[in-house]
Structure formats: structure tokens, C-alpha cells
Amino acid sequence: MSGFTHTAPECISIEASGDLSTKQYLFVDVNSDGQVAVETSAGAAVVGVLQDKPSAQGRPACVMLSGVSQVVAGAAFDAGARVTVDTAGKAQEATSGQYIHGTALKAATAADDRVAILLQLNSGQVA
């Protein structure tokens, strides 16, 4: 993430829905039990990006709501792309009818790259 710093981030702690130890930097949402889980519906609304690795249900999960966060890419996209969530909780370029969750500050050259995203959660839908 050279060239960028995490300025004025806003994180909250929410109970994990299960073992999220391999889900760091994925988009998450709150389930019907009030716990955080990886979002698996492409283009859906999210609550934020998981910042840590909670290892069991009920453990606190740090979720970033605003600022600049690393996010795992689900596919390649350019810097400046408006991104949304894919079916694995990763970032992908938003298409028609999908919620925009941020702007890529760096390009993702392949799936599973970690890139800096300026979070703008649920900021609108692509027309």
C-alpha cells in the first residue's frame, strides 16, 4: 500500500458468526443473529471490511466502516474503479444494479491481490 496511509478510519467491534480467521480484508455484513459474516451475494449491501482474524463464533471482529482499507480483490480492476462485493466477499468492479462500496486507489492485477480502497459503503448503485 505504498503512498497511502490509513487516516481517520472508523472501526467497530461486532461478534463473529464463526471462524473468520481466513477472511481478513473481505467485505462483511451483519446476519440475523447480530453477528458479522462474509457477504456472499454479489453486489449486495455490506456493513464494512473485516480487519482482523477472529477464530471462533462470538469473538470480537474489527470491522472498518470508513477510511482507507485493504481489500482482497476477486478479479483484476483498474485504479479508480468503483468496486462492490463478489460471491466470496472480495472486491470486484461494480456493474449495473450493484451497490458501490468504494474506489480503488491502486489497481488489482489479479484475483487475491490486496489493494487499497477508499471506502464509500453502499454509496449508490451503478446505473
Question: PLM features: residue spans?
Answer:
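Surface-exposed, low-hydrophobicity beta-strand/loop segments enriched in small/polar/acidic residues
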Residues: 1-127
